[in-house]
């Protein structure tokens, strides 16, 4: 078990959990996740230097009530070919641990040839163990900084490991689960200010009856309290207040930015909101399903209040109700923690990616079709300060079909480290992530956000748009110091799209009435085969842009012709984020198909545009 090599760190972790201090370590390094209605809790600590994770599972055996506990690591929540550590305890008489994996049909649990679940401590109520990020074992999942899934179960019996395998346990509903998690995450941020100086601002709906339709955007415009309108404050944290987790898809809070136009309070569907309400479009806080609270770094806070701050803010809640449920009452919203003593920098939020428009489309039957959204060098050159900006947080966002999202960073012809990347993105888990590496973006840099979509099983085309059945591609970046640049997004230029439809009509003989006709109708008129899918991908990858380099009032920056703007050129495929350092696979394991690979079941690696280059 190599206990000597980890004595100090194991001591730190184990004693920290029992509140005995043998070394000074902050609680910011400890992350936690409730596995079972707060009865069973997982705590973990990432050791970036040694590239390993320490785990502690509290109340795993419930003081001897259960004898076997399994915790597994899965790429997308699938139960087949999942990497499990299985622990057994019999009233402190003996303890047992096996590194295992599930079979392709999820019927059997097989013991690994190499054992990599290193136990630090076990008793009849808890488990503490560690595992390397990458064990170089094809029978183990590689830990990464994107979305992973924890699969767990427990039994009141011991498993029969005859011939080094057993039947996958059939745990009761209360004693198993699957949860998304970012395992390799940055340390938590502690609010520097004392709790006594924190003030709370709440913006939430007022007992709204959720409409029995698939997609509803509900808006509420409210006036800030006088203590906020008089003095500028900094937001240091915001957290969601969710009434109906199965209906609330995402929420945003916007600042109203107007030129002396009067804003009225409002509470109703966003489509019916007065025109003045649409001036409330500067993002202040946002949340999407799966996320928790978000805390700003100690050097920055998001401005709110003061004499120059419009006293109105707008809450927008997206209800996703595909089952058309009725009779549900909702008062969801945000709690915002603010301080009056300002921090060094004003922070801000910027939208990267694609416009919400039906100019972009995804053909059916694709494994991972890419769409690209650009923040071109000409925009950052005009809009960013001379010393640039620092990005400290990022929230990737798509709707139902998104399976991979990343934002690349370019300075001239040089590609810098990625801003954010999730090769196993899930629309069910769209948290704002603190960035361990904080990109420094200078004027003249370019940012390219790519989203990949899985449309297998869909018979018709998917268009860009606001509905949950449409698609989006966005990266909300949190940065400082604040600038006037609110949106840096793109779409294919109108001329390029017209030329594409004309080609489909004249050359491909598709049933398009007019290249200038409604875009959605033109897309839906195309009969999609592999050749036409390739042509569409090539068109998106090479065509000039309609660029939105926008201020918070929705107006573009002056100084450049944003229509038919040039794309940012870059190399395919996407660079490897974490090159593996394994020497070689042991000869007796070379026959085994790695749990990290598969025939396109690993959507993070089976990417359409990469395979296309090999044709």
Feature map (PLM): residue ranges:
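Short acidic/polar inter-strand loop motif in beta-rich domains
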Residues: 135-137, 320-324, 452-461
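Short, surface-exposed beta-strand/strand-loop-strand elements in extracellular ectodomains
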Residues: 250-259, 403-415
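Cleavable N-terminal signal peptides of Sec/SRP-targeted secreted and luminal proteins
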Residues: 7-22
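Long, hydrophobic/aromatic-enriched structural stretches that serve as scaffold segments
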Residues: 252, 257-258, 262-314
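Extracellular-facing/secreted segment signature in eukaryotic proteins
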Residues: 22-196, 266-291, 527-529, 535, ...
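Solvent-exposed, flexible loop/coil segments flanking beta-strands in beta-rich domains
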Residues: 27, 33-40, 185-249, 323-401, ...
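Noncatalytic modules at the cell exterior or secretory-pathway interfaces
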Residues: 126, 236, 301-320, 439-453
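Exposed beta-sheet edge/beta-hairpin loop segments within beta-rich domains
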Residues: 118-123, 140-143, 284-310, 325, ...
């Amino acid at each position: 078990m190599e206990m000597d090599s980890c004595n100090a760190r194991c001591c730190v972790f184990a004693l920290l959990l029992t509140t005995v201090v043998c070394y000074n370590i902050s609680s910011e390094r400890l992350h936690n996740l409730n596995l079972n209605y707060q009865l069973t809790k997982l705590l973990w600590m990432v050791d970036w230097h040694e590239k390993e994770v320490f785990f502690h599972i509290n109340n795993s055996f419930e003081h001897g009530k259960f004898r076997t506990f399994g915790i597994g690591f899965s790429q997308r929540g699938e139960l087949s070919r999942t990497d499990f550590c299985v622990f057994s305890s019999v009233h402190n008489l003996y303890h047992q641990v096996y590194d295992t994996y599930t079979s392709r049909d999820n019927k059997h649990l097989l013991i690994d040839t190499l054992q990599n679940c290193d136990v630090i401590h076990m008793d009849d109520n808890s488990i503490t163990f560690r595992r390397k990020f990458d064990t170089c074992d094809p029978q183990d999942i590689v830990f990464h900084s994107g979305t992973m899934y924890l699969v767990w179960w427990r039994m009141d019996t011991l498993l029969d490991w005859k011939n080094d395998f057993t039947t996958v346990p059939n745990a009761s509903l209360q004693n198993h689960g699957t949860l998304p998690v970012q395992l390799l995450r940055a340390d938590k941020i502690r609010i520097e200010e004392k709790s006594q100086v924190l003030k709370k601002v709440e913006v939430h709906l007022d007992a709204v009856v959720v409409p029995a339709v698939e997609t509803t955007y509900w808006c509420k415009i409210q006036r800030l309290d006088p203590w906020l309108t008089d003095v500028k404050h900094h937001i240091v944290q915001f957290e969601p207040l969710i009434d109906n987790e199965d209906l609330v898809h995402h929420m945003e809070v916007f600042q109203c930015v107007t030129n002396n136009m009067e804003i009225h309070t409002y509470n109703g569907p966003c489509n019916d909101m007065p025109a003045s309400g649409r001036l409330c479009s500067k993002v202040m806080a946002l949340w999407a399903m799966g996320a928790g609270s978000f805390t700003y770094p100690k050097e920055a806070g998001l401005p709110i209040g003061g004499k120059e701050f419009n006293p109105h803010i707008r809450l927008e809640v997206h209800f996703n109700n595909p089952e058309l449920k009725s009779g549900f009452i909702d008062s969801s919203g945000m709690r915002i923690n603010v301080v009056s003593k300002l921090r060094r920098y004003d922070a801000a939020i910027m939208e990267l990616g694609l416009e919400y428009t039906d100019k972009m489309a995804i053909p059916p039957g694709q494994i991972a079709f890419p769409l690209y959204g650009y923040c071109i060098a000409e925009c950052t050159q005009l809009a960013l300060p001379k010393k640039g900006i620092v990005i400290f947080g990022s929230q990737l966002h798509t709707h139902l079909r998104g399976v991979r999202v990343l934002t690349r960073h370019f300075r001239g012809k040089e590609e810098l480290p990625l801003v954010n990347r999730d090769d196993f993105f899930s629309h069910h888990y769209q948290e704002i992530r603190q960035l361990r590496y904080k990109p420094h973006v200078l004027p003249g840099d370019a940012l390219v956000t790519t989203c990949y979509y899985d449309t297998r099983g869909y018979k018709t085309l998917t268009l860009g748009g606001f509905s949950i059945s449409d698609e989006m591609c966005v990266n909300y970046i949190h940065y400082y110091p604040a600038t006037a640049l609110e949106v840096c997004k793109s779409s294919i230029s109108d001329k390029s799209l017209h030329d594409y439809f004309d080609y489909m009509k004249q050359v491909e003989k598709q049933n398009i009435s007019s290249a200038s006709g409604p875009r959605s109708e033109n897309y839906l008129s195309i009969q999609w085969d592999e050749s036409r899918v390739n042509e569409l991908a090539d068109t998106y990858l090479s065509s000039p842009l309609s660029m939105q380099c926008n201020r918070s009032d929705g107006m573009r920056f002056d100084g450049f012709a944003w229509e038919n703007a040039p794309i940012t050129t870059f190399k395919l495929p996407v660079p490897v984020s974490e090159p593996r350092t394994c020497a070689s696979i042991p000869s007796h394991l070379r026959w085994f198909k790695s749990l990290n690979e598969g025939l396109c079941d690993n959507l993070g690696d089976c990417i359409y545009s990469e395979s296309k280059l090999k044709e």
